[in-house]
């Protein structure tokens, strides 16, 4: 799981900018890309 997260982080960070208040949408977007 750690390996998948490490690979996904840059991918969803580039697609979904994270704002302090947008934690839930950001996590959802990360899961979708994974």
UniProtKB/Swiss-Prot annotation:
GO terms for molecular function: toxin activity. Keywords: Thioether bond, Toxin. It comes from the Eukaryota. Residues 1-10, 18-34 form a propeptide. The keyword Hydrolase does not apply. Coiled coil: none annotated. The keyword tRNA-binding does not apply. There is a cross-link at residues 12-16 (2'-cysteinyl-6'-hydroxytryptophan sulfoxide (Trp-Cys)). InterPro entries: Amanitin/phalloidin. There is a cross-link at residues 11-17 (Cyclopeptide (Ala-Pro)). Processed by the macrocyclase-peptidase enzyme POPB to yield a toxic cyclic heptapeptide. POPB first removes 10 residues from the N-terminus. Conformational trapping of the remaining peptide forces the enzyme to release this intermediate rather than proceed to macrocyclization. The enzyme rebinds the remaining peptide in a different conformation and catalyzes macrocyclization of the N-terminal 7 residues. Toxin that belongs to the bicyclic heptapeptides called phallotoxins. Although structurally related to amatoxins, phallotoxins have a different mode of action, which is the stabilization of F-actin. Phallotoxins are poisonous when administered parenterally, but not orally because of poor absorption. Belongs to the MSDIN fungal toxin family. This is Phalloidin proprotein. It comes from Amanita phalloides (Death cap).
